[in-house]
Curated annotation (Swiss-Prot):
This is Small ribosomal subunit protein uS15. InterPro entries: Ribosomal_uS15, Ribosomal_uS15_bac-type, uS15_NS1_RNA-bd_sf. PANTHER family: RIBOSOMAL PROTEIN S15, BACTERIAL AND ORGANELLAR, SMALL RIBOSOMAL SUBUNIT PROTEIN US15M. It comes from Dechloromonas aromatica (strain RCB). The gene is rpsO. One of its GO terms (molecular function) is structural constituent of ribosome.
Length: 89
């Protein structure tokens, strides 16, 4: 299921660096993580849905690229983010 506007607004408010910040890597990674977490149960029921799985892999790849970018720019912000989101590492 897609993220609702209220859920998106809550995520943006939690991870934004300043008011109205939707483009920082933290916000983008948090939104991608929420979308990935919403898609994951779908694959438990529909294991042969390869078309959607390709989209999921694209989201995971996009999140990885943003995390790598953030790690290169500011390691402390990277570590804080992965701890808050509960990502491994």
């Amino acid at each position: 299921m897609a993220l609702t506007t209220e859920n998106k607004a809550a995520i943006v408010a939690d991870y934004a660096q300043s008011k109205g910040d939707t483009g920082s890597p933290e916000v983008q990674v948090a939104l991608l993580t929420a979308r990935i977490n919403d898609l994951t149960p779908h694959f438990k029921e529909h294991s042969k849905d390869h078309h959607s799985r390709r989209g999921l892999l694209h989201l995971v790849s996009q999140r990885r690229k943003l995390l790598d970018y953030l790690k290169g720019k500011n390691v402390e912000r990277y570590r804080t983010l992965i701890t808050r989101l509960g990502l491994r590492k």
